Curated annotation (Swiss-Prot):
It catalyses: a 1,2-diacyl-sn-glycero-3-phosphocholine(in) = a 1,2-diacyl-sn-glycero-3-phosphocholine(out); a 1,2-diacyl-sn-glycero-3-phospho-L-serine(in) = a 1,2-diacyl-sn-glycero-3-phospho-L-serine(out); a 1,2-diacyl-sn-glycero-3-phosphoethanolamine(in) = a 1,2-diacyl-sn-glycero-3-phosphoethanolamine(out); a 1,2-diacyl-sn-glycero-3-phospho-(1D-myo-inositol-3-phosphate)(in) = a 1,2-diacyl-sn-glycero-3-phospho-(1D-myo-inositol-3-phosphate)(out). The chain crosses the membrane at residues 104-124, 180-200, 455-475, 488-508. Forms a homotrimer with a solvated central pore, which is connected laterally to the cytosol through the cavity within each protomer. Acts as a lipid scramblase that uses its central pore to function: the central pore opens laterally to accommodate lipid headgroups, thereby enabling lipid flipping and redistribution of lipids added to the outer leaflet of ATG9-containing vesicles, thereby enabling growth into autophagosomes. Residues 632-657 have a biased composition (Low complexity). Phosphorylated by ATG1. ATG1 phosphorylation is required for preautophagosome elongation. Glycans are attached at residues 163, 166. The gene is ATG9. Homotrimer; forms a homotrimer with a central pore that forms a path between the two membrane leaflets. It is found in: Preautophagosomal structure membrane; Cytoplasmic vesicle membrane; Golgi apparatus membrane; Endoplasmic reticulum membrane. GO terms for biological process: autophagy of mitochondrion; lipid transport; piecemeal microautophagy of the nucleus; protein localization to phagophore assembly site; reticulophagy. This is Autophagy-related protein 9. Residues 798-817 have a biased composition (Basic and acidic residues). Belongs to the ATG9 family. Keywords: Autophagy, Cytoplasmic vesicle, Endoplasmic reticulum, Glycoprotein, Golgi apparatus, Lipid transport, Membrane, Phosphoprotein, Transmembrane, Transmembrane helix, Transport.
Length: 879
């Protein structure tokens, strides 16, 4: 049996049989734009899904080889989202050996922290170590300061804590805080060991999947790009499509709409895989892009104290950053901080939002797409925020401890991250921008600081040089000569050397070229972040200060993370609950259902007709021109809602005010940028939405015009053409992912060549659409050749007259001395027919081709009339 054949595929019952929801809701189907849409009813919250049969999962695998085990695992996947997440985690971890090694070293690191901290606190007598006695009997060896049997005393003290036995005989030196620290760290260590032991079977399954099904050995995972893994997964899905019923989506659809839902399994492409892996992260990216989260510290202030607090740090309900907060009664808040996401706050948001929106299988809970549950959901989210605020206030010391042990990061990066962008691609993009960003921050003129630091460096260097020369002359001065009491030459050499290094580091290099605009343009090329207020001001101090907040010093990040643990309870208790209504509305209004994938964030679908700007030269606007699925014409005249894959969007007509004032487009062209970056990352992926293809074609056309002197599009318009993707005319110089960029240049040139060939084939085939008869010549030939052709046909005899068949037409064309190129066009016409004109390319350029064909038909009709007149005159002449 060949590889990839699913002989172990279990027998799958008809997806339309056994409907569980018969009689619940109407079965409605409609067709729009050539696609079938299904109006699905929402399962009530009280309805529990029936437990799935464990027969397949408990099916024995005795006697199967490694490949058969991998194939058995694939065809028995019941949670495709979770499986693909494990596939990606395995790829990101660089294979089973790297993953196991990293986890074992993490366990050893935790164990070392426990053992070393116990040794430092319990096993050293610091009174002897820091003794001021400077006699011959002074401390000189480690064993002189060690506490005898310190580990034994520590263990007996723990037994005393547990059993309440007498511990007077044991001199335990550890404090209660250290004891608590060790208990928590030990529990964390045990949890890590248990998690690692439970993950070993899944790692082995992933190893077999990569090695035997995908054909990727463990050594090649570190060098193989992710798009190649996606392509291999698509090939496996093509041969073994059983997991198309993943997460119960297809079964539920079939039960609701009947046999019409039966369709061949859809392929699993890069877009579907990214939507499944990043189903939850895409919502967070959209929330930050739409600025729906108020992460500033807001503390209510009593009215009697407002007169004693500066007005600059007070905020009223009317000044609230969110529309939902402006409806509250007049109230003053003490507000400070900015909308920055720290690690501790991100943990809480994931629990409060994602844990509330998604079920245990990672699917969107269906009550979030219904308007009638809105009030209950808003109240539930508010209670969730308040509860987590109280919980964070209680456990703040332990959260700080975990941050110190674990790690801490900057999380303003959610503003940089794009839809359907996997974490390793995002990290690679930021890593490429780091050196250039550092160069941009450092090169800004600091003349006054440089003058002072040059003076400090001169003074410190002079002292350090004198001490160094003296030490070289007499080495005994280095260790025994005390400049101040108990401070030798060695100490002051270290002090002056440090001052010299710091001061010289703050002086810019003399040969450095000052060009902040070029540096920031290069940074934007990778970060894809260029706010409108920055454009035209890249050289200003304002942009420099704003940018410096994004690339802060590590020590500042460290203190901000620790401070956020204290401030997070206030944000959760006072700032986020008023945002609950806007968040619930966002989840409902920006959630769509894609057949075969499930509910996803609408921006991640790349539906330009609903949520994007199809015109690459169109300036980005706010509410003007931004339309929703139910709110008027879509961008560039496209009818709202014509994706090639069936989608169902849930909105309600009972909230027209909210829908009317909702900005349906992403801020700062986030969806357009995400689409282009995803296309550049996966060149083989073809967008299924016609509006996406049209956007890409227009962007390429704009870049082509700019390269040929058509004039660049001004960056001030705010459109994509003026951005890093526009190619030529933006504030970023047309680099990056644009048609002039290094990433997409070859891909776009190939697309242009393919499109030119498609137009040539269309022209060739369209020239034969009008069938020639006894009075009709080839529409593209010269009139004189047409006249001679008619004479030959008239003299050809009765047998050839009136032969309107394709074969007869082909014979006449061949006997007229056609060239080889014309014979090839005749063969294409005969084999493929007229209908192929409307399916020329994979880029949905049918509208353009139809317009070209319409013009050709008119030319053919005119020449037909001319040929008819010539035929009559020639007939009279022959008579």
């Amino acid at each position: 049996m060949g590889k990839g054949e699913g002989y172990l595929d279990p027998t799958i019952l008809s997806v339309a049989s056994g409907s569980r929801n018969s009689g619940k809701g109407k079965e409605r189907t409609r067709r729009k734009g050539g696609h079938k849409y299904h109006s699905l009813h929402v399962q009530d919250e009280e309805e529990e899904e029936p437990p799935e049969s464990d027969a397949l999962r408990t099916r024995g695998k005795v006697g199967l080889n490694a490949y058969e085990k991998a194939l058995w695992k694939w065809v028995n996947v019941d949670d495709l989202d979770g499986f693909l997440q494990e596939v990606y985690d395995y790829y990101k971890g660089k294979g089973i050996y790297c993953i196991v090694l990293a986890r074992v070293l993490n366990l050893l690191t935790t164990f070392f922290v426990i053992a070393f901290s116990t040794f430092l606190i319990s096993c050293i007598d610091y009174s002897k170590l820091f003794s001021s006695i400077s006699t011959a009997e002074a401390v000189g060896r480690l064993e002189d300061v060690l506490v005898a049997q310190c580990i034994t005393k520590f263990v007996h003290f723990k037994l005393y804590i547990l059993n309440k036995t007498n511990s007077s005989a044991y001199d335990y030196r550890g404090s209660f805080a250290h004891t608590l620290f060790l208990i928590i760290l030990s529990a964390f260590f045990i949890f890590q060991v248990a998690s690692f032991a439970m993950s070993v079977p899944r790692l082995l399954d992933m190893y077999r999947f990569y090695t035997h099904l995908l054909g990727v050995p463990d050594a090649d995972i570190q060098t193989l790009p992710w798009p190649e893994i996606v392509r291999l997964i698509g090939d496996i899905r093509k041969h073994n499509p059983v997991t198309s019923l993943s997460n119960g989506q297809a079964t539920a659809l079939a039960d609701m709409v009947g046999n019409d839902a039966k369709a061949p399994a859809k392929k699993l492409d890069a877009h579907d895989i990214a939507n499944r892996i990043l189903r939850q992260e895409n919502y967070l990216i959209a929330l930050f892009n739409k600025d729906l989260l108020d992460l500033r510290v807001r503390i209510p202030v009593p009215h009697v104290l407002t007169a004693f607090i500066p007005s600059s740090i007070l905020i009223s309900s009317a000044d609230a950053p969110l529309p939902s907060l402006q409806s509250e009664p007049e109230r003053k808040f003490l507000s400070f901080g900015a909308n920055h996401l720290t690690k501790a706050l991100e943990w809480n948001l994931r629990f409060c939002l994602l844990g509330y929106l998604f079920d245990r299988r990672g699917q969107v809970r269906k009550e979030f797409v219904r308007e009638k549950r809105r009030k209950d959901l808003v109240q539930g989210l508010r209670r969730r925020f308040i509860f987590m605020g109280i919980l964070n206030a209680i456990f703040a010391p332990f959260i700080i401890l975990y941050l110190l042990i674990y790690s801490f990061f900057r999380y303003f990066e959610w503003k940089f991250r794009e839809f359907n962008e996997l974490p390793h691609l995002f990290e690679r993009r930021l890593d490429r921008s780091y050196e250039i960003a550092k160069e941009y921050v450092d090169q800004f003129p600091k003349e006054r600081t440089a003058l002072v630091m040059r003076f400090v460096a001169f003074i410190a260097g002079s002292f350090a040089a004198v001490l160094l020369v003296a030490s070289l002359i007499d080495p005994d001065l280095f260790l025994h000569f005390e400049i101040t009491p108990h401070r030798t030459v060695l100490f002051y050499l270290g002090v002056f050397g440090s001052i010299l290094a710091i001061s010289r580091g703050m002086v810019p290099q003399e040969n450095m070229v000052f060009d902040p605009e070029a540096s920031l343009n290069e940074v934007v090329r990778w970060t894809h972040y260029l706010p409108v207020e920055w454009r035209g001001q890249l050289h200003s101090q304002m942009v420099h200060q704003e940018f410096s907040k994004l690339f802060a010093l590590k020590i500042m990040i460290f203190f901000s993370e620790l401070l956020s643990v204290i401030l997070t309870p206030f944000i959760l208790f006072f700032s986020l609950p008023p945002c609950a209504a806007a968040i619930i509305d966002f989840f409902r209004e920006f959630t769509v259902h894609v057949d075969g994938v499930g509910y996803v964030c609408s921006f991640a679908v790349f539906d330009f007709a609903r949520y994007g700007n199809v015109d690459a030269n169109q300036p980005e606007t706010g509410l003007e021109g931004a339309t929703g699925p139910d709110g008027g014409p879509a961008a560039d005249g496209f009818a709202a809602g014509k994706p090639s894959r069936p989608t169902t969007r849930r909105t309600t007509s009972s909230s027209p005010s909210r829908l009317k004032h909702r900005d349906w487009r992403g801020n700062e062209n986030k969806m357009e940028q995400s689409f282009l970056h995803f296309k550049a990352t996966h060149p083989d992926w073809q967008p299924s939405d016609p509006s996406s293809s049209l956007f890409l074609d227009r962007l390429m056309g704009a870049g082509t015009r700019n390269r040929h002197g058509g004039g660049p599009v001004s960056a001030a318009t705010g459109g994509i053409s003026g951005s890093i993707y526009g190619g030529g005319g933006g504030g970023v110089g047309g680099r990056g992912l644009g048609v002039d960029g290094s990433v997409m240049a070859e891909m776009e040139e190939e697309r242009l060549r393919a499109k030119r060939q498609s137009y040539e084939r269309a022209w060739a085939k369209s020239s034969h659409l009008h069938r020639p008869d006894s009075s009709h010549s080839h529409p593209l030939r010269h009139p004189h050749s047409a006249a001679s052709e008619i004479i030959e046909e008239e003299e050809g005899g009765e047998g050839d007259k009136g032969d309107d068949s394709i074969d007869g037409w082909s014979k006449r064309v061949k006997t007229d001395g056609e060239t080889d190129d014309e014979e090839e066009r005749e063969r294409l016409w005969k084999d493929e027919g007229v209908i192929i004109i409307f399916f020329l390319t994979n880029n949905h350029i049918t509208v353009v081709v139809m317009n070209v064909c319409r013009c050709i038909f008119r030319v053919a009709a005119d020449e037909h009339k001319t040929a008819g007149r010539i035929n009559k005159s020639q007939t009279r002449r022959l008579t």
